């Protein structure tokens, strides 16, 4: 009877003559193993060979292999997004199991094996009170299977822990992940800053900002207490090697000897970023496990400073360790772009210059300007460089070969490198009037824009001649974040006379709205009920709050989860950063060279009048405010 080979995850140093059938590599001596010596022998290569002593023996070893695979899947499931923890997938079965093993799996599919149960038929600890009393092989199996179940520990350090971003966004996002089970129970969270505080001081600061989402109310108080008990404070300056050494030492105390992973969130001013990163790189990287750092935008002030920043980071870390975060890329709208394009046949065949007339990306804020735009970076460096260009890249990229982060980033950078040099005349800058700024308590310097509109073109076969219109501003009439994809007119439209005077009413349009109410809208033409033939433009809408009765996770929660999971497709790679600066640097240099003054507009208005002329210049209808 021919039995399939069973490759168990062990090695063997002994050697013996070769036999046949079911070869299994083991790490320990089998002198005490509960089978007869005639049932096995050793090959010259050091492999254990199970002789044909009946199917029961191989079935027992195949069962052990199934149990180990199931345990591995149980261990790894916690780190997979949207996948049941205890499910052994069909893919895994067909990849790792032979025909006989699959047959055994069919017989035992309904049985839910407990983690402590030995598939050989008895508990590994049966009859033994201490692990040290176990026979050598059983003890070895117990140790190996214990390793399978053991999870790597995780330490997260927030540098700049007392800042507004950390208090208002980062710690609440970490708590939401902890509540949902996306952080291990024994996670250690460290706050690092220059202030002289204690662990209890940090916990008090954090407690004032933590809340439970509507769908996270069960045992909310208990979860908060547990989360705060896992937070610790380290006093250390931005380039304080002693402080980082103390942080690393305290991490080691918590991690013990097990595999340990570390994340460092650098919530620090741009001028301190390099010092902090280099100090971490020299003193606090994980000795066992991976280390990842999160860097906040903007990524430099211009091409030169961005290059120096990248060079400094890569001198201490590998590219795969660096996660350049833009919280606006954590919105559900951004993740939906690739889903809509590549999972719906109704869209992807039309996603090109033949059918699409223009694409508009709109970010309109009704509130006063934030401090970020008042520090000399301005709206172009802060929003257009990362969020807007990344959105365009995801909209325009070719289908990646897989959903792996590197494959997606490879396609995004191709789009960025294909964007035509921007004509300075196709860039409109605006700033809401000083009286409005004074009234709202925000003081800007004379040239920092609070509004930017621009026309971009992508020089490739898919998008040749299609304008991508961008408008970003604050202090405007309406708060909204939307993407408009306007399709071309129907050739030879039979109903042209029935649509009305404005021919643009007859064009189809896809609207992806993130705020104020997330929705997917499709504008279509339909007949008005009644006698005669009159057409109307209507909207098919998917309103998320009506369709999904759940609170959408915050963008920081989404992105930090991706960092833990190692998913980097929403984070900019260094070549993407450089390509984005190559697009914007010539425009910024022209603005600085000629001291271009932004056009003033009323606070709460529609923005600069020149933006309307820019839309008309490129033949694009203005999306209604």
UniProtKB/Swiss-Prot annotation:
HAMAP family found in the cross-reference section: G6PD (MF_00966)
Family in the record: Belongs to the glucose-6-phosphate dehydrogenase family.
One Pfam family it belongs to: G6PD_N
Binding site for D-glucose 6-phosphate: 297, 327-331, 365, 382
Record: residues binding NADP(+) 2: 471, 480, 513, 606
Superkingdom, taxonomy of origin: Eukaryota
SUPFAM superfamilies: Glyceraldehyde-3-phosphate dehydrogenase-like, C-terminal domain (SSF55347), NAD(P)-binding Rossmann-fold domains (SSF51735)
General remark: There are 6 glucose-6-phosphate 1-dehydrogenase genes in A.thaliana.
GO molecular function: glucose-6-phosphate dehydrogenase activity; NADP binding
PANTHER family with a match to the protein in the record: GLUCOSE-6-PHOSPHATE 1-DEHYDROGENASE G6PD, INACTIVE GLUCOSE-6-PHOSPHATE 1-DEHYDROGENASE 4, CHLOROPLASTIC
Native organism taxonomy: Eukaryota, Viridiplantae, Streptophyta, Embryophyta, Tracheophyta
Protein's UniProt name: Inactive glucose-6-phosphate 1-dehydrogenase 4, chloroplastic
């Amino acid at each position: 009877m021919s039995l399939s080979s069973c490759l168990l995850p062990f090695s063997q140093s002994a050697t013996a003559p070769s036999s046949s059938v079911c070869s299994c590599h083991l790490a320990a001596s089998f002198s005490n193993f509960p089978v007869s010596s005639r049932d096995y022998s050793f090959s010259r290569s050091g492999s254990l060979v199970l002789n044909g002593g009946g199917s029961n023996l191989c079935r027992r070893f195949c069962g052990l292999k199934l149990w180990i695979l199931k345990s591995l899947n149980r261990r790894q499931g916690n780190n997979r997004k949207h996948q049941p923890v205890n499910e052994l997938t069909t893919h895994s079965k067909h990849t790792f199991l032979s025909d006989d093993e699959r047959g055994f799996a069919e017989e035992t599919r309904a049985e839910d094996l407990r983690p402590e149960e030995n598939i050989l038929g008895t508990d590994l600890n049966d009859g033994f009170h201490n692990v040290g009393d176990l026979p050598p092989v059983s003890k070895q199996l117990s140790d190996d299977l214990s390793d399978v179940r053991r999870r790597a520990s995780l330490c997260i350090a927030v540098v700049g822990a007392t800042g507004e971003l950390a208090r208002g966004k980062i710690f609440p996002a970490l708590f939401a992940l902890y509540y949902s089970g996306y952080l291990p129970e024994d996670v250690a969270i460290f706050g690092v800053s220059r202030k002289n505080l204690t662990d209890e001081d940090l916990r008090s600061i954090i407690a004032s900002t933590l809340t439970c989402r509507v769908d996270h109310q069960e045992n909310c108080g208990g979860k908060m207490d547990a989360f705060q008990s896992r937070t610790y404070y380290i006093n250390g300056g931005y380039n304080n090697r002693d402080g980082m050494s103390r942080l690393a030492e305290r991490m080691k105390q918590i991690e013990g000897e097990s595999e340990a992973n570390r994340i460092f969130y650098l919530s620090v001013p741009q001028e301190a970023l390099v010092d902090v990163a280099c100090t971490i790189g020299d003193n606090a990287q994980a000795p066992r496990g991976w280390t990842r750092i999160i860097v906040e935008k903007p990524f430099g002030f211009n091409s030169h400073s961005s290059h120096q920043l990248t060079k400094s980071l890569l001198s201490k870390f590998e590219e795969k360790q660096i996660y350049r975060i833009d919280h606006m890329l954590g919105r559900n709208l951004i993740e939906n772009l690739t889903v809509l394009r590549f999972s719906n046949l109704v869209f992807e065949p039309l996603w090109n210059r033949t059918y699409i007339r223009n694409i508009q990306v709109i970010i309109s804020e009704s509130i006063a300007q934030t401090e970020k735009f008042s520090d000399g970076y301005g709206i172009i460096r802060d929003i257009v460089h990362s969020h807007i260009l990344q959105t365009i890249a995801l909209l325009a990229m070719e289908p990646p070969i897989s959903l792996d982060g590197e494959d997606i980033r490879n396609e995004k950078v191709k789009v960025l490198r294909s964007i035509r040099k921007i004509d300075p005349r196709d860039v409109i800058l605006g700033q809401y009037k000083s009286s409005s700024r004074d009234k709202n308590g925000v003081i800007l310097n004379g040239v920092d824009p609070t509004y930017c509109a621009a026309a971009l073109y992508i020089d490739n076969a898919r998008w040749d001649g299609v304008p991508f219109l961008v408008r970003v501003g604050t202090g405007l009439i309406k708060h909204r974040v939307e993407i408009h994809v306007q399709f071309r007119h129907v050739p030879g439209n039979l109903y042209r006379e029935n649509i009305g005077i404005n021919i643009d009413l007859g064009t189809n349009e896809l609207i992806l709205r993130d705020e104020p109410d997330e929705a997917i809208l499709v504008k279509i033409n339909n007949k008005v009920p009644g006698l005669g033939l009159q057409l109307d433009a209507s909207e098919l809408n998917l309103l998320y709050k009506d369709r999904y009765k759940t609170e959408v996770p915050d963008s920081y929660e989404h992105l930090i989860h991706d960092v833990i999971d190692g998913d980097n497709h929403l984070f900019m790679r260094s070549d993407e950063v450089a390509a984005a600066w190559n697009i914007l640097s010539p425009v910024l240099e022209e603005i600085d060279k000629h001291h271009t003054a932004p056009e003033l507009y009323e606070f709460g208005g529609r923005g600069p009048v020149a933006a309307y002329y820019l839309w008309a210049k490129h033949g694009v209808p203005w999306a209604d405010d």
